[in-house]
């Protein structure tokens, strides 16, 4: 799949954070995947652990991880591919939960907490 000019700018702009906003089916997942892989292949970053990618859905985060893992394997970057499942690619809720769990004892919260869904919140209120 060839990149559009806008997608290519996203992939090749590695020295600044980006927000990618576009409609369904426009190639956001593909573009973010290519950007992450390009950052590793070019040596801009040394490890997939240096990536933070926030998506709106867990499904999209899973798809990005799957595609990045496949591209890294195909490019001979097996060690990095093995680390993708632990990469910081998630929803904003997933990222915040991960940070809270990592510091749960310091914060005085149960590290096995769950995030309340909308129905639970309504019940509690």
Short names for language-model regions:
Residues 1-110, 115, 119:
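P-loop NTPase Walker
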């Amino acid at each position: 799949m060839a990149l559009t000019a806008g997608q290519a700018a996203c992939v090749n702009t590695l020295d600044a954070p980006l927000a990618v906003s576009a409609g369904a089916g426009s190639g956001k997942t593909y573009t973010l995947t290519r950007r992450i892989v390009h950052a590793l292949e070019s040596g801009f970053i040394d490890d997939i652990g240096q990536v933070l990618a926030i998506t709106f859905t867990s499904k999209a985060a899973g798809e990005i991880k799957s595609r990045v893992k496949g591209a890294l394997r195909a490019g001979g970057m097996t060690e990095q591919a093995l680390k993708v499942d632990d990469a910081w690619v998630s929803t904003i809720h997933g990222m915040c939960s991960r940070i809270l769990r990592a510091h749960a004892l310091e914060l005085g919260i149960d590290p096995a907490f769950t995030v309340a869904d909308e129905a639970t919140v309504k019940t509690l209120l």
